[in-house]
Amino acid sequence: MIRVAIDGPAGVGKSSTSKALARHFGFAYLDTGAMYRACAWWCLHQGIDLDGDQVDEQQITEAVAEFFTGDHFDIGVDPDHPSITADGEDISEAIRSSEVSSHVSKVSNVIPVRHVLIAAQRAYIARESAADSFSLGRGIVAEGRDITTIVAPDAEVRVLLTAREEVRQARRTGQAVAGAGVGGEDVAARDRADSKVTSFLTA
């Protein structure tokens, strides 16, 4: 099995590049950013307060752990039809809402939550080595934060995508106008948030 790990800052084109590669080679596609968004959606759905400067990290961690260990979560790895489900409900569009976008960092910045997600991501990657997996054992393209440095530092292919800030901001704004649900987020603000919990270059 070939593992391709693609990392980089917000708005650089990780998703479109990753899906194109997976489609070309017949690999599975794993959007780890969507997994973090799904966790934020789940916490909000469970009535957890994610507003304000202080959040209950233990409550968030317990909710996320239940989300994954309680068989509530699933992710589709078909690059043509990637999906996220919670208790059988397709929430692929719901996790791209402005409400989720504005709260996802409150969940993703909780270190124990990241540990849960990293373990889950590694499990999904390992699953593709099986002959009866989506890729029939060929491989997987995984994209998102920590992929090249923490989740799969030993991947056969590791890619760091970069682009100028103004280019990334233009892409984000264009996605918002096109209705992609990313809300035209400020990539500079996202960079600052990411820098607190992830390093693209340190393996």
Placement of each model-derived feature along the sequence:
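Hydrophobic positions on the alpha1 helix immediately C-terminal to the Walker A/P-loop
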Residues: 17
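Active-site signature of alpha/beta-hydrolase-fold catalytic machinery across serine-
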Residues: 20
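ATP-dependent NMP and nucleoside kinases share a basic, alpha-helical "lid"
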Residues: 92-176
